[in-house]
């Protein structure tokens, strides 16, 4: 009795031993994975309308074997993957979601054109891919109307560009700005329009000018630059037409002499004039009667005595 009285206070406050199959925390918090369960025939009276699918709801496809998932534990969130919707599987879904899923999977030939949101096959259907790759028709712009006469065999000169978008009064200013990107060989101004065709010395200079498309000059003029497609301008200039003019920026103008170097006209006396004057007939002749100092003994004695 004494041993039982000593043990009794300890056993009264301690919890009873847990049962073999009881758990205090849900399995998803303990990191337990759902164990695979072999498919078993189930009656229609069981709750689980997600597993009951007819061929009509599946879009006419033959019925597939349904693998039921184990029953979720109390208080646990759903454990199915988010990719189950993409695969078209209704396993682990509620009955309401299982009814909506077959309708989302059924696609008619026109469903790709309608683009119903929420359907995955719209992004991968051949009809939608064909619509994405279809090019839009050419827009109506001045360059497109000029390019009607071009064919695939025509080869354009890449050194030509077309500058447009400036008022006619600022044509010389724009031409001076584009002269900073390279050596301009020729340029053709439009008589009535707001564009001009410019030819550079190299293709690299033309590409540098093409990169200035959309640049604002003088804080008021936005300029557009495109490759020149006016083949008539290129052909007329190649034949030596008088409509072209060579533009050289004043900053890069070299200083050339006004007369050829082969025939110099100088007003300065050449350096050889002094040598020619020394050999002329007029020379200074020394006089023979020029007095000289006497170096004799008597003159030295007189200079010593009298100080002469």
Swiss-Prot record:
Domain RRM Nup35-type, chain residue ranges per copy: 155-235
Pfam families: RRM_Nup35
InterPro entries: Nucleoporin_NUP53, Nucleotide-bd_a/b_plait_sf, RBD_domain_sf, RRM_NUP35_dom
Cellular component GO terms held in the UniProt record: nuclear membrane; nuclear pore central transport channel; nuclear pore nuclear basket
GO biological process: mRNA transport; NLS-bearing protein import into nucleus; nuclear pore organization
GO molecular function, one term: nucleic acid binding
Positions of modified residues (Phosphoserine): 54, 61
Subcellular location: Nucleus, Nuclear pore complex
Keyword annotations of the record: mRNA transport, Nuclear pore complex, Nucleus, Phosphoprotein, Protein transport, Translocation, Transport
Region spans: Disordered: 1-80, 242-265
Keyword Phosphoprotein: yes
PROSITE patterns assigned: RRM_NUP35
Function statement: Functions as a component of the nuclear pore complex (NPC). NPC components, collectively referred to as nucleoporins (NUPs), can play the role of both NPC structural components and of docking or interaction partners for transiently associated nuclear transport factors.
Family: Belongs to the Nup35 family.
Protein name (database record): Nucleoporin NUP35
């Amino acid at each position: 009795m004494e041993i039982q009285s000593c043990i009794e206070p300890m056993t009264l406050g301690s919890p009873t031993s847990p049962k073999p199959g009881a758990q205090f925390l849900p399995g998803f918090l303990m990191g337990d994975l759902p164990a695979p369960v072999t498919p078993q025939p189930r009656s229609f009276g069981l709750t689980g309308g997600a597993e009951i699918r007819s061929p009509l709801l599946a879009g006419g496809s033959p019925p597939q074997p349904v693998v039921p998932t184990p029953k979720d534990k109390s208080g646990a969130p759903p454990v199915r993957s988010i990719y189950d919707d993409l695969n078209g599987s209704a396993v682990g879904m509620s009955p309401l979601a299982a009814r909506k899923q077959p309708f989302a999977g059924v696609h008619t030939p026109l469903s790709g054109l309608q683009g119903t949101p929420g359907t995955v096959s719209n992004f991968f259907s051949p009809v939608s891919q064909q619509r994405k790759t279809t090019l839009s028709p050419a827009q109506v712009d001045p360059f497109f109307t000029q390019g009607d006469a071009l064919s695939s065999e025509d080869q354009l000169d890449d050194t030509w560009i077309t500058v447009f978008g400036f008022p006619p009064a600022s044509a010389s200013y724009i031409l001076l700005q584009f002269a900073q990107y390279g050596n301009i060989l020729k340029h053709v101004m439009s008589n009535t329009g707001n564009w001009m065709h410019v030819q550079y010395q190299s293709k690299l200079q033309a590409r540098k000018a093409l990169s200035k498309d959309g640049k604002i000059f003088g804080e008021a003029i936005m300029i557009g630059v495109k490759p020149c497609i006016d083949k008539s301008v290129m052909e007329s200039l190649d034949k030596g037409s008088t409509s072209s003019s060579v533009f050289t920026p004043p900053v890069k103008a070299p200083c050339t002499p006004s007369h050829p170097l082969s025939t110099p006209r100088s007003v300065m006396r050449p350096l050889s004039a002094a040598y020619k004057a020394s050999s002329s007939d007029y020379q200074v002749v020394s006089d023979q009667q020029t007095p000289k100092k006497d170096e004799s003994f008597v003159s030295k004695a007189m200079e010593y005595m009298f100080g002469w």
